[in-house]
Amino acid sequence: MKTHLTIAASKENEMKKVISVYQTQVFIVILSLLILMMALGFNAHAAKLGLASAWLFDDNGGKTVKDVVSGHDGEIKGSLEWVNNGKFGGALEFPGKGDSYVRVDHDDVFNSDPYSFVAWVKLESASWQYVVWRNGDVWPEPENVRHLDIWIHDADYPVFMWHVNGNVGRIDGKTIIADGNWHHIAKIYDGKNVQMFVDGKVDGEAPSGGTLDTSESPIWIGARPGNVAATGLFDEVGFFTEALSEDELNNIMDNGLAGYAPVEAAGKATTTWALLKTKNK
């Protein structure tokens, strides 16, 4: 009788182990499916917004700023310094020298019509600075094709410039942003109008005057030729092939580009940078 009871107990224990293993496997499958659904959702959202490039500035070393969306990596020129006190995770510190900037090679995607450009900056007050430049590697510029051009006036407010059939368009902002604090700056071009957003609010707008002239120039982040450069930190720079709505822009400003730029972790299931980054105030 004892033998039969022992055998029965042993079988019961084995059955419990089998059930436990099965439950664990089911949990892993469900968790993997949830992660995959999140990743696919982020991919779909990113595709909807037309996110073409996202430079998150989390590389923490080296001479390359990775574009986690499409591989338009930026090359670090001069003496930029990696820091860990960005708006979201890491950042690059720019010393205000014209030879120190991030250079991204030309791609036709950057001639998109419409488009949106976004960036977090923490700039010190200085005499004339540059956020982004796209009109060649020399100064004076050989031709007026400022398809993407954002600079900081000597009085510390932002200025947008562009060209249509060689004619210049311009918006002068109202908000001081070179004040040692983090500010989110965005240019939204919908094919007819250009809007300047600072910290999620419209700071200036104007008709574009037509379709913006296109360029085959690289992107310079943090400087332009002729020794005009930024002094401060840059983080979360992104380029979209769509004109973002105000709500979409504010969501990106508040939550970062991470959720729109899923990446493949080495040897692991797809995850998103949104789960890995820390927001700094």
List PLM regions with ranges.
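Extracellular glycan-recognition modules
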Residues: 48-52, 60-65, 97-159, 168, ...
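Extracellular glycan-interaction patches encoded by glycine-rich segments
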Residues: 93-94, 105-106, 163, 174, ...
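Extracytoplasmic low-complexity segments
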Residues: 34-98, 250-281
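N-terminal secretory signal peptides that target proteins for export/translocation
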Residues: 1-28
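Short strand-turn-strand beta-turns centered on an Asx-Gly dipeptide
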Residues: 197-204
